[in-house]
From Swiss-Prot:
Protein's UniProt name: tRNA-specific 2-thiouridylase MnmA 2
Keywords per UniProt: ATP-binding, Cytoplasm, Disulfide bond, Nucleotide-binding, RNA-binding, Transferase, tRNA processing, tRNA-binding
Homology family: Belongs to the MnmA/TRMU family.
Catalyses which reaction(s): S-sulfanyl-L-cysteinyl-[protein] + uridine(34) in tRNA + AH2 + ATP = 2-thiouridine(34) in tRNA + L-cysteinyl-[protein] + A + AMP + diphosphate + H(+)
Pfam families noted in UniProt: tRNA_Me_trans, tRNA_Me_trans_C, tRNA_Me_trans_M
GO molecular function, one term: tRNA-uridine 2-sulfurtransferase activity
GO terms for cellular component: cytoplasm
Interaction with tRNA as annotated region, ranges: 144-146, 300-301
Amino acid sequence: MSKGTVALAMSGGVDSSVSAYILKERGYDVIGIYMDLWRDEREEYCNKSAAEDARRVAEKLDIPFHVINIEKKFKNNVIDYFIDEYLSGRTPNPCVACNKTIKFEAFFNAAKEFGADFMATGHYCKIEERNGRKVIVKAEDDKKDQTYMMYNLKQYQLERTIMPCGEYKKDHIREIAESIGLDVYNKKDSQEICFIPDNDHGGFIKRNYKRKISEGNFVDKEGNIIGKHKGIIYYTIGQRKGLGIALGKPAYVIDINPITNEVVIGEEEDIFRTELIAKDVNFIPFDKLEKPMELEAKVRYSAKPSKATIIPLENNKVKVVFQNKQRAITKGQSVVFYDKDILAGGGIIEGIV
């Protein structure tokens, strides 16, 4: 007897491909769906090979397969946001935006239109029930854990979402793929932003932003001009390489001012801070933070969680006070909270105190 119908987001990669197999083995009726998201004016990013890989896997596993076009919504909610953030002197996190508006909104709704009871992805996260609520738990494979990107999810989404890969090590996923004859078993993991395969975000913005990127001044902490920069989109907090200025000592980006079009340069000690303000906060194990709470937090995907006090503020904001200084806290990035192995929530870094 079927456990229900699952609409699976298929990318043509090994994780979503093996997810299809696991779900089918567990007794679900699986529908494979590939999302056509973006075409750069220079090349087709959502290329035919990825879609064809997904289609071949679906045929191999004998599951229905569909391609849906979400290009317009992806442009409005991910591409435009990505460009606007860099133009505003912030460093965006497009994967967080994509999960919030595309995978767990547009795809979530598409799954219902296909008659699915659940949706599934190949993300490395676990969804469990604790104290009567659905929570997101760190993956078995700590190196592949993707919970950092998931803090925006709501209860109604978690109740209808399955993430099979969270229970496995990546090597095991590849072994399963090879054992069942999927030719994507050794396909490389994507390391860059999916719509910028060459990892040149500045070039991407120049191609897709129809106005000139203005050069400006590098200034020191006192406001003295110390050089020329090629446009604020090319810089982020903590950056040292590629500045093109010689000061006789290591120089770091410590602030970006979009109003004056200035990039502020300082020393390494200037990029270590302990406090920040985050906006658009969402919590998962509970609806609202009523009082200060001791949790662990991290300010980028690759960072290790560090002890911090999360203090509720008005307008869905929090103040985060770390016990230890954090390197290069960056406006526009996400600060994400953990309670041991549980993803407690997160928000967008708005200010550095």
